[in-house]
Amino acid sequence: MTSEKPQNESFIQKIKSTSLVSQIIVAIILASLLAVISPESAKAFGMLGSLFVNALKAVAPILVLVLVTSAIANQKMDSSAELKPIVGLYFLGTLSAALVAVLLSFAFPTELTLDLAGATANPPQKLTEVLATLAFKVVENPVTAVASGNFIAVLAWGLGLGFSLKHASESSKGMVHDLSEAISSVVRIVIRFAPLGIFGLVANTIATTGFSALGEYSHLVAVLLSAMLIIALLVNPLIVFIITKKNPYPLVFTCLKESGITAFFTRSSAANIPVNMALCKKLDLHEDTYSVSIPLGATINMAGAAITITVLTLAAAYSLNIEVSFATAILLSVVASISACGASGVAGGSLLLIPLACSLFGINNDVAMQVVAIGFIIGVIQDSAETALNSSTDVVFSAAASHHITKE
């Protein structure tokens, strides 16, 4: 009897030490096999997927509220003018990424197989309707907004509280930061159950629809990766060339090789900060500048996240046969860019902000969270590529802006 306990503990420790990516890959393989061997059993495991989606729905609103409040309240922007062009490039890059994602989604629309039983969508017909809906959603009671998943109001209250708390005492700001960390830790616990949830979702999906759903996911991944490659290899080099008037590709390829590859496997912009710092030193950039711009970039430079939010939101709209005008898509790009800045440091952060963007099209929380769950299924590739783009771009823009400053 005594020998069983150490063996059980060893098994649990082994599971804990295995990366989440590996667990998700194993879950997808096992779910696919179960769906082929015993479709009825696979459908029964669909409950695990439903539990996971409901857990995401529970944590997402309070996460966005506290995260945005803390990020703004504790933001310490350096007064040095040298940072202004870098920050400007960060926002330009993020907005450009969202626009590229819109164009690719228009050219290659993705429709997903979703459970639409009881789902509602009240798509706006004109841009004026979108703006009117936004205005009314913004002024909702914060408690009601969190309870009902009104992410527009949640974001507005987060911004309002954050700017108000910028002038609060350091102890008050510290308390908000601690609360943000606590909520983030709860989210990490939920994400740890992602392999079980994804097992249930994949098993039920394949048992119900066959392997056609996985074909949809491959199309979705192709659109996401194409948008990220266009930003990394075309848009970012163009921005660097306009600033430096030099061939941008030696810098871009150096950053992709020395920062992007590491970030691809760590899947964390924050964890990649030391790598980026060392690369900036190797590139002989000003330490006073990059010591601030790199950590700042890990927080607000979120081109990959903007692409993920935009592509998956438009996929949800197409799945519900919602007509998306170009003007509304541009508004989505702006919302996705702003939302992406709050995705840093949170497990599945960009995915959990999708409901916020979906609310622009009147898509309810139930459908939005199904799209989030699909995001976790493809997250093995999506999150790695997203982080690689985000982190390598931090150095690309820091180097380009530093060159511009030196020239002046």
From Swiss-Prot:
Residue ranges of the TM segments: 19-39, 48-68, 86-106, 143-163, 193-213, 223-243, 294-314, 322-342, 367-387
Question: Which InterPro entries does the record associate with it?
Answer: Na-dicarboxylate_symporter, Na:dicarbo_symporter_sf, Ser_Thr_transp_SstT
One GO MF term attached to the UniProt entry: neutral L-amino acid:sodium symporter activity
Q: Which domain of life is it from?
A: Bacteria
Catalytic activity entry: L-serine(in) + Na(+)(in) = L-serine(out) + Na(+)(out); L-threonine(in) + Na(+)(in) = L-threonine(out) + Na(+)(out)
- The main location is membrane
Pfam families on file:
SDF
Q: Where in the cell is it found?
A: Cell inner membrane
The annotated topology with respect to the bilayer is: Multi-pass membrane protein
GO terms classed as biological process? serine transport; threonine transport
Which cellular components does GO assign to this protein? plasma membrane
Keyword list, A-Z: Amino-acid transport, Cell inner membrane, Cell membrane, Membrane, Symport, Transmembrane, Transmembrane helix, Transport
Protein family (similarity comment): Belongs to the dicarboxylate/amino acid:cation symporter (DAACS) (TC 2.A.23) family.
The record's section on NCBIfam families has:
PRK13628.1 (NF010151)
Q: What does this protein do?
A: Involved in the import of serine and threonine into the cell, with the concomitant import of sodium (symport system).
Quote the protein name from its UniProt record.
Serine/threonine transporter SstT
